[in-house]
C-alpha cells in the first residue's frame, strides 16, 4: 500500500506540473525495496524493524542532499519562490538550515524507532506497563514533537533570516 501511495504521489505531482522530488523518488525506491524483501523473505522481523529502516533511509537521503549541495527543501521552496532568487546565497542558506532541522527531526524519529524496536525485540524492560509507556513516548511523543518543531521552524525561519539580514545590513531584503 505504501509503495502504491509513493508512486501515486509522484504521478500526482507530475500531473499537477510539479517537478519530481528527490525525497519522493527515494521514498518510492525504499518502499519498493521493502515490499520486495517482504515478499521474498520471512518478513516477521519487519513488524519490529520497518520504522527504523524507513527513518534511516529517509535520513540518508536528506543528508545526501546536503552533501551534494542540493538540500532537499530547495525543490519544494522553488515551487513558491521566484526563479530569480533560486541561486542567491540567502535562498541556499535558508534551505540548508531548514534541511538540517528536518534532518534533526528525522534523526530523533530514527532514534525513537530504534528504541521501540529494541524494546519489542528483547526483554530489556521487565514491566509491561513501563515498556508500553516508553514505547509510546519513543514512538508517538518523539515523532509529534520532532515534526511540529520542524514544521514551525520551516514556516518561521525564512522571514526571520531576512529580517535579521535587514537589521545587520540596513537594507531591504
What are these regions (language model features)?
Residues 1-4:
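Structural signature of hydrophobic alpha-helical transmembrane segments
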Residues 27-39, 58-61, 171-173:
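Small-residue-rich segments of transmembrane alpha-helices in multi-pass membrane proteins
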Residues 7-19, 154:
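C-terminal ends of transmembrane helices
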Residues 16-18, 40-48:
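Membrane-interface helix caps and helix-loop-helix hairpins in membrane proteins
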Residues 82-173:
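C-terminal membrane-adjacent module
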Residues 47-65, 139-147:
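Alpha-helical transmembrane segments
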Residues 19-31, 48-57:
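Cytoplasmic-side transmembrane-helix entry/capping segments in multi-pass membrane proteins
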Residues 63-80, 98:
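Membrane-water interface of transmembrane alpha-helices
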Amino acid at each position: 500500500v505504501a509503495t502504491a501511495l509513493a508512486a501515486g504521489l509522484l504521478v500526482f505531482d507530475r500531473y499537477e506540473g510539479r517537478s519530481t522530488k528527490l525525497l519522493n523518488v527515494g521514498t518510492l525506491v525504499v518502499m519498493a525495496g521493502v515490499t520486495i524483501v517482504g515478499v521474498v523473505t520471512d518478513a516477521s522481523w519487519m513488524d519490529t524493524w520497518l520504522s527504523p529502516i524507513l527513518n534511516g533511509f529517509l535520513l540518508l537521503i536528506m543528508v545526501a542532499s546536503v552533501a551534494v549541495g542540493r538540500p532537499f527543501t530547495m525543490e519544494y521552496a522553488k515551487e513558491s519562490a521566484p526563479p530569480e532568487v533560486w541561486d542567491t546565497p540567502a535562498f541556499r542558506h535558508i534551505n540548508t538550515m531548514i534541511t538540517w532541522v528536518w534532518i534533526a527531526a528525522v534523526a530523533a524519529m530514527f532514534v525513537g524507532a530504534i528504541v521501540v524496536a529494541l524494546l519489542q525485540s528483547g526483554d530489556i524492560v521487565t514491566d509491561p506497563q513501563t515498556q508500553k509507556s516508553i514505547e509510546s513516548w519513543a514512538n508517538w511523543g518523539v515523532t509529534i514533537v520532532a515534526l511540529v518543531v520542524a514544521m514551525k521552524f520551516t514556516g518561521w525561519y525564512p522571514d526571520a533570516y531576512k529580517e535579521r539580514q535587514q537589521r545587520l545590513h540596513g537594507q531591504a531584503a
